[in-house]
């Protein structure tokens, strides 16, 4: 990806695991600088999913412009590609108004796709697949994995020797493109992301404190009506467990409880555990990112630290 030049408009990315305080910090930033908030959250795109997605309340939305929330109903789907298109459109509008987009959220895939685009892989080829299947019958999939290791060691390292489906697909891409699948995946739809990005990451200095926050947060959601929220969505939209909205952390566990698959106590336990696992994945994404300005989300005077950092970047005229 070619980097935008210094004349490109600025954008601030505020990223972090769930329960790290992103939303509160976004409000503080918006009260100090001419920004508009763009949600980067795969649950907040859904209407009626307010409590479990921790949407800002109506008064905050009136005070501070928020974008990309309440886009679709819970029985609909929303892709990373759609997010990229919508986000770029919204960001262009914010910039045209002389303001700075402040992108806030924890859906790390959305952040990545927004900046890097989506890689395009060739469609399946029946003839190549038949040839690969024949070779596998003769040699076995572990031997095919060895072939893949020579052609694309990066991808082979991620695939188990008996994972026939993924081995076949990786080899198929190699044969169809003449390039390793790992190289193809780096080729993005867009050469340039037309913004200078300032990446701010909230990283907990003490993971156990973040875990305690997650437990308290989930309990608060239950206290203020998460079960009733999911019940209304289930009854009004006839959603099922395999729909994207009900695969969101918290919603899945409450849905299982409403379907009498688990008890109330188990729902709470599973909800907290799933949220902690989500936070772990989010932190893994963040630690793999480049050009990241990290702040301890548990630090005292965190808002002042981040506001001071933004001021030093001379983002605003």
Curated annotation (Swiss-Prot):
Name the EC number(s): 2.5.1.75
Q: Which GO terms describe its molecular function?
A: ATP binding; tRNA dimethylallyltransferase activity
Note the SUPFAM superfamilies from the entry. P-loop containing nucleoside triphosphate hydrolases
Q: Which EC class heads this enzyme's classification? A: transferase
Q: Which GO terms describe its biological process?
A: tRNA modification
What's in the keyword line of the UniProt record? Answer: ATP-binding, Magnesium, Nucleotide-binding, Transferase, tRNA processing
Q: Name the site position(s) for Interaction with substrate tRNA.
A: 107, 129
Identify the stretch(es) annotated as Interaction with substrate tRNA.
41-44, 165-169, 247-252
Source species, domain of life: Bacteria
Q: Which Pfam families match?
A: IPPT
Q: Where does substrate bind?
A: 18-23
Q: What chemistry does it catalyse, as a reaction equation?
A: adenosine(37) in tRNA + dimethylallyl diphosphate = N(6)-dimethylallyladenosine(37) in tRNA + diphosphate
Q: What cofactor does its activity depend on?
A: Mg(2+)
Positions with a binding annotation for ATP: 16-23
Its quaternary organisation is:
Monomer.
The entry's family comment says: Belongs to the IPP transferase family.
What PANTHER family has UniProt attached to this entry? Answer: TRNA DIMETHYLALLYLTRANSFERASE
Q: Tell me, what does this protein do in biology?
A: Catalyzes the transfer of a dimethylallyl group onto the adenine at position 37 in tRNAs that read codons beginning with uridine, leading to the formation of N6-(dimethylallyl)adenosine (i(6)A).
Query: What protein name is recorded for this chain?
Result: tRNA dimethylallyltransferase
Q: Which organism is it from?
A: Nitrosomonas eutropha (strain DSM 101675 / C91 / Nm57)
Gene that this sequence comes from: miaA
